[in-house]
Design a protein with these regions (language model features):
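A short aromatic-anchored loop/beta-hairpin motif
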Residues: 1-125, 129-186
Length: 186
């Protein structure tokens, strides 16, 4: 029997016609995936009304040296909960290494470190996450809802939000314009 394929440290790309507008052109950085379920942070959209400085001020943290970076819409689950995906040069007590590709942190410590100029070299912020129960993601993948690509650091930290989905497909050698939501038999 083959070992199960877990997707931590990879990107999920929504296939055209995924059928859920919340995930249209979604790029999800997978952080946890095992037999009990999966958790990923969406990187395909940003929140229109709040930047990183606004978030810090709401938490009574002076922005200091932090850039006023966009806040990504991490997903529909717990949209008020904040997450930072970042390089491994910073780690807090509750930080989670994700397959050696990036680190996930969700405490005030990382926000304070970023504001003080002592945080990770590269990072992205998000509110909410995408979550799946045990076997749920696998079912969606069998229905051709998602495409998997390696967790490329450049796509995570450097790609512009509105081009990230297409760039991720192209980095895998796939032209997303040629994809369809329909399946057939030969």
């Amino acid at each position: 029997m083959d070992a199960p394929l877990f997707l931590s440290g990879q990107f999920l790309l929504a296939m055209p016609g995924i059928g859920d507008p919340r995930f249209d052109k979604a790029v999800i950085a997978m952080c946890v995936h095992d037999e009990e379920g999966a958790l990923g942070i969406g990187l395909g959209r940003v929140t229109p009304r709040i930047g990183f400085h606004d978030l810090l001020k709401q938490l009574d943290i002076a922005p200091g040296e932090a850039p006023n970076a966009p806040i990504h819409q991490g997903g529909p689950v717990e949209p008020q909960r904040g997450f930072i995906l970042h390089t491994s040069d910073w780690g807090g007590a509750d930080s989670i290494d994700v397959a050696g590709r990036w680190v996930l942190s969700a405490t005030l410590d990382i926000l304070k470190a970023i504001a003080e100029g002592k945080g990770p070299r590269r990072w992205v912020a998000a509110l909410g996450y995408a979550g799946w129960g045990g076997g749920q993601l696998e079912q969606e993948m069998r229905r051709h809802g998602w495409f998997v690509t390696p967790g490329d650091e450049n796509l995570l930290y450097e790609s512009e939000v509105d081009t990230r989905w297409g760039n991720a497909f192209r980095s895998a050698g796939v032209d997303p314009r040629l994809l369809t939501a329909e399946s057939g038999t030969a």
